[in-house]
Amino acid sequence: MGIAECRDKVLGGGELTKDEARGLMEADVTELAAAADEITRRFNGDGVDVEQLNNIKRDGCSEDCTFCGQSAFYDADKEPHPLPEPEEVVRAALKAKKEEASSYCLVAAWREPTPEGFEKVCTIIQEINTHVGISVECSLGFLTRERAARLKGLGVKRYNHNLETARSKFPEICSTHTYEDRLDTLEIAREAGLELCTGGIIGMGESRGQRIELAMELARIRPEEATVNILVPVQGTPMELQAPLPPGEAERFFALVRFLLPRSVVKISGGREKALDDDGRAILRGGANGIITSGYLTMGGNDSSADMEMIREAGLEA
């Protein structure tokens, strides 16, 4: 089945098979992106979900994810940053709202929150709700059912917990927890009524087949948001010498994710400024309808004004 037939199947409410997904990844990337854009417009309109992050607990993570510069395994001398005071986070959230962000995500580099850390995060969320009025999302590691219910009760809209890569690739990426651990937290979040944000990182040496495998897993989960990062190798990690993806491969993957998740937010996340010549402008017309702006967890990014201008120049709306 070709691009047009797959597009029409999706527009008609159908779901693609793995063989059809495999065929799309072999198709002409320009035609594929154009068809993905048609699907995006049909189901999602011209709006772009603009998100800002706050890395409220940085470095010293106990997990050994080979791509991550925040892991204690690869820089044991790096001291973990303490959680900021709520007032500091409120100021940053107010700035994000002024810069037209539609959501604000609190991110913490740990396996799971300590009891004291979780309570402080809850206080931060309450203060943002009181003083800012922006949609709050969280990425805090593994969840218990009790904590998921608490976050839902505080008005948290969406919970991020990435799969990172395909199940078949995951043992090469991390040994301190399993793929099933990640799936379990997504299930706990969903059971609590939280929307799901999940995705991964492409360009970590996985095969094209493994990228398809990841995309099919995302299609099975059906998150409200799928977030796709492109690896930026971090010095001192096992991935520091990883070669970049071939040209067009990121564009293919974003388009495929749109075919598989026609109604979800598909977000261009970390790595776009370094891995893509146009900062992701073409992908906003090739399947994506969301971006993270104003920097990421450990590296900078475009400021919000540049990204808002990019969105407008693409004929879209923040």
Swiss-Prot record:
Which E.C. number(s) belong to this protein?
A: 2.8.1.6
Query: Looking at the keywords, is Translocase present?
Result: no
Q: How is the cofactor bound?
A: Binds 1 [4Fe-4S] cluster. The cluster is coordinated with 3 cysteines and an exchangeable S-adenosyl-L-methionine. Binds 1 [2Fe-2S] cluster. The cluster is coordinated with 3 cysteines and 1 arginine.
The residues listed in the UniProt record as binding [2Fe-2S] cluster, with positions renumbered to this chain, are 105, 138, 197, 267
Q: Which reaction does it catalyse?
A: (4R,5S)-dethiobiotin + (sulfur carrier)-SH + 2 reduced [2Fe-2S]-[ferredoxin] + 2 S-adenosyl-L-methionine = (sulfur carrier)-H + biotin + 2 5'-deoxyadenosine + 2 L-methionine + 2 oxidized [2Fe-2S]-[ferredoxin]
This chain belongs to the protein called Biotin synthase
Q: Which pathway or pathways does this protein act in?
A: Cofactor biosynthesis; biotin biosynthesis; biotin from 7,8-diaminononanoate: step 2/2
Transmembrane segment boundaries: none
Q: Which family does it belong to?
A: Belongs to the radical SAM superfamily. Biotin synthase family.
- Lineage, opening ranks: Archaea, Nitrososphaerota, Candidatus Cenarchaeales, Candidatus Cenarchaeaceae, Candidatus Cenarchaeum
Note the Gene3D superfamilies from the entry. Answer: Aldolase class I
Q: Where is the Radical SAM core domain?
A: 46-272
Q: Name one GO biological process term.
A: biotin biosynthetic process
Record PANTHER family: BIOTIN SYNTHASE, BIOTIN SYNTHASE, MITOCHONDRIAL
Enumerate the InterPro entries for this protein. Answer: Aldolase_TIM, BATS_dom, Biotin_synth/BioAB, Biotin_synthase, Elp3/MiaA/NifB-like_rSAM, rSAM
Pfam families the UniProt entry points to: BATS, Radical_SAM
Keyword line: 2Fe-2S, 4Fe-4S, Biotin biosynthesis, Iron, Iron-sulfur, Metal-binding, S-adenosyl-L-methionine, Transferase
Q: Source species, please?
A: Cenarchaeum symbiosum (strain A)
GO MF annotation list: 2 iron, 2 sulfur cluster binding; 4 iron, 4 sulfur cluster binding; biotin synthase activity; iron ion binding
How this chain assembles, per its entry, is:
Homodimer.
The positions annotated for binding [4Fe-4S] cluster are 61, 65, 68
- The source's superkingdom equals Archaea
- Its biological function? Catalyzes the conversion of dethiobiotin (DTB) to biotin by the insertion of a sulfur atom into dethiobiotin via a radical-based mechanism.
Its cofactor is:
[4Fe-4S] cluster; [2Fe-2S] cluster
